[in-house]
């Protein structure tokens, strides 16, 4: 998690200081700051649920990569899971680590604060964790045929 924060902050710094967000017009930077202010002002319960739902989709995409054999099927599954979480407006803590940092680095108003960054990341991270563990990780752990998995592992070894 700490490594993701560091990566998000470094990536945000590189993007903002490259000038790409402020090009010939400030539309991109203004859009980023507007969206960051919305994310920082979202109530904690909504952030938690958006994080929970998001990570169910992200974990399903990851799980399907292990279960599907064909590369094309894997790509399609990843695309649809990620497309769904993005278009539905769900929240992922790792994506927000960089995006919210961009809003802090760009010229912004009082709605964008370091406290808002922590508010969003804390609730979304908690939702991501519970969504991934309770709704994907544990159910698949309990339904996986352990005898078959052990035999497959022995064949590989």
Language model features with spans:
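Alpha-helical transmembrane segments and their helix-helix packing motifs
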Residues: 1-157
